Amino acid sequence: MSETWEALRKKARSTENSIDVKLVSLNKLTASSHGGFDIDEKTVSSRQTSFKTVTTEIEGLIEQLTNINDDMNDVAGAQSSASWANNPAIQHTLRRHREILRDYGSEYRRARDNVDQVLQRELLLSSSNENRNNPILNNRARGYDMYLKENDHINACDRLLDEQLEMAMSTKENMARQGINLRGISTRLHHISKKYPAINNLMQKIKTKKQKNTLILAAVISSCLIFTIFWIIN
């Protein structure tokens, strides 16, 4: 199973590198923004096409990396009794890959929202430039500007929700990690009890004695209650 782990680890690193390259390409769409008013619709349309292509590719890679992390977690959990799986470095690697995935998700959403806002403004400016002499279309452009401001508020709310979701995912990951540790402890105790029958026998005797003491205590309490009730009646 260690071979499977190494294969998944290499695949995770390769996917992370691909996401990193795509994020650079996405951020370049913002860096290449004109920032002025001499923008034509053809240029904006081309940039929007590139934006859709890059975001689709990044979302696919993030989903792929999520599945790889889940597979790594399953492999480590299934082999919690193996010596290599108990190595602290394995748990550190799992935690590090989850942190990288979470960081990539945050960075992608931030870059996506920024580029989307820039492209929407450029589209508005390009429409305004072409229809500057048309008062009806100018009024429509002002309506678009109000829409963009409202969209900025919505995006701000989305970012707050993303932060809350990230906190929830972090809590889920911590619980999953604790579950793996508990399964490992349970497995080791099971192996110890099989390896050392004397310990297993001692645990069984302790359990039997506790049950016997519980029965004796229950009998004494019942007798006292019966005697008390009988004494009250008479």
Swiss-Prot record:
What is the recorded membrane topology of this protein? Answer: Single-pass type IV membrane protein
The signal sequence is none
Transmembrane feature ranges: 213-233
Enumerate the Pfam families for this protein: V-SNARE_C (PF12352)
Coiled-coil positions = 54-121
The record's listing under InterPro entries reads: Golgi_SNAP_su1
Q: Which residues lie on this side of the membrane: Vesicular?
A: 234
Q: What is its main location?
A: Golgi
Give the GO cellular component terms, alphabetically.
Answer: cis-Golgi network; Golgi medial cisterna; Golgi membrane; SNARE complex
- Keyword set for this entry? Coiled coil, ER-Golgi transport, Golgi apparatus, Membrane, Protein transport, Receptor, Transmembrane, Transmembrane helix, Transport
Biological process GO terms, please?
A: endoplasmic reticulum to Golgi vesicle-mediated transport; inter-Golgi cisterna vesicle-mediated transport; protein transport; vesicle fusion
Subcellular location as annotated: Golgi apparatus membrane
Consequences of knocking out this gene: Reduction in brood size at adulthood. Abnormal tail structure, and loss of the T-cell derived rays, R7-R9, of the male-specific sensory rays, but ray sensory function remains intact. Combined with ykt-6 knock-down causes reduced seam cell leading to loss of ray phenotype. At cellular level, reduced expression of Golgi-resident proteins like mannosidase II, and more so in combination with ykt-6 knock-down.
Q: Which GO terms describe its molecular function?
A: SNAP receptor activity
Positions in the Cytoplasmic compartment: 1-212
Q: How does it assemble?
A: Component of several multiprotein Golgi SNARE complexes.
Its biological purpose is as follows:
Involved in transport from the ER to the Golgi apparatus as well as in intra-Golgi transport. It belongs to a super-family of proteins called t-SNAREs or soluble NSF (N-ethylmaleimide-sensitive factor) attachment protein receptor. Cooperates with ykt-6 for proper expression of Golgi-resident proteins. Required along with ykt-6 for normal embryonic development, seam cell division or differentiation, and ray formation.
Into which family does the record put it?
Answer: Belongs to the GOSR1 family.
The protein's name in its UniProt record:
Golgi SNAP receptor complex member 1
